[in-house]
C-alpha cells in the first residue's frame, strides 16, 4: 500500500539519491516483510545520547531532516501537528536534525516557525541517517511498537492529513491497554 504524499526530491537530488527518491514516488511505502529496525543513536538538545531502544513500546515516526533542506522545512509544521495528534496514543515523532550546528541552529528554527510539539533531537554526525540507510532528505521511517520498520517515505509529506495519521496508527499498532484508558 502507498499513500500519496506530495512531490518527490528526485529533481533536487543527484544520481543515486534521485533514483531512491523516485523509488518511493513520494509515497509512504510499506516495508514488506517488515524488518527489525537497526540500532541507531542520536542526541537530545543537551547532548545526552539516546537510541531507538529507549522508545520501545512506542510507535515511532523517525524523520531525518535539516534546516538547509527546503522540502524538510516545508513538512515540519505538519510533523509538529502530527506529533500533537498522536502523542496521547504513545506515538513519538523523532525529527532528527542533521544540522552540524546542532541545538544552536535547530532551537531558533523551531522558535521562529512555532514548532511546539516536536522534541529537539540531533543527528549532526549522521549516525542515525547512515544506520537507517537514508540516501536523501527528508526521509521518514515508521517503526512499530516492537521495533520493526513498517514503512518509509523519501521526500516531504503532509503528515497531519487524516489518511496519513490513520496509516501511521495502523502501522505502529494499537497503544498498550493502560494508555487506552487515559
Regions found by a protein language model. Give the residues of each.
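N-terminal export signals
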Residues: 1-20
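N-terminal "domain-start" segment that seeds a small globular fold
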Residues: 21-52
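Short active-site neighborhood of thiol/selenol oxidoreductases, capturing the structured segment around
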Residues: 52-70
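Alpha/beta-hydrolase fold active-site loops
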Residues: 59-60, 91, 138, 148
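Conserved hydrophobic packing residues within short motifs/helices of P-loop NTPase cores
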Residues: 60-62, 94-96, 141
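Structural microenvironment flanking redox-active thiols in thiol-disulfide oxidoreductases
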Residues: 74-113, 124-130
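Thiol/disulfide oxidoreductase modules built on the thioredoxin-like
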Residues: 111-116, 123-170
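Non-globular targeting/processing and membrane-anchoring segments
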Residues: 174-182
Amino acid at each position: 500500500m502507498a499513500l500519496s504524499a506530495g512531490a518527490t526530491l528526485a529533481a533536487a537530488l543527484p544520481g543515486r539519491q534521485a533514483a531512491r527518491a523516485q523509488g518511493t514516488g513520494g509515497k509512504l511505502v510499506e516495508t514488506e516483510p517488515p524488518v527489525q529496525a537497526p540500532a541507531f543513536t542520536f542526541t537530545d538538545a543537551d547532548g545526552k545520547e539516546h537510541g531507538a531502544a529507549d522508545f520501545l513500546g512506542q510507535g515511532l515516526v523517525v524523520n531525518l531532516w535539516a534546516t538547509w533542506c527546503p522540502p524538510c522545512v516545508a513538512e515540519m509544521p505538519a510533523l509538529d501537528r502530527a506529533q500533537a495528534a498522536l502523542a496521547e496514543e504513545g506515538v513519538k515523532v523523532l525529527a532528527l536534525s542533521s544540522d552540524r550546528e546542532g541545538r544552536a541552529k535547530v532551537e531558533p528554527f523551531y522558535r521562529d516557525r512555532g514548532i511546539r510539539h516536536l522534541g529537539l533531537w540531533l543527528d549532526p554526525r549522521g549516525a542515525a541517517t547512515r544506520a537507517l540507510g537514508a540516501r536523501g532528505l527528508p526521509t521518514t521511517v515508521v517503526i512499530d511498537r516492537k521495533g520493526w520498520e513498517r514503512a518509509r517515505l523519501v521526500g516531504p509529506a503532509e503528515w497531519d492529513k487524516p489518511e496519513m495519521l490513520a496509516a501511521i496508527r495502523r502501522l505502529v499498532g494499537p497503544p498498550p491497554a493502560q494508555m487506552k484508558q487515559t
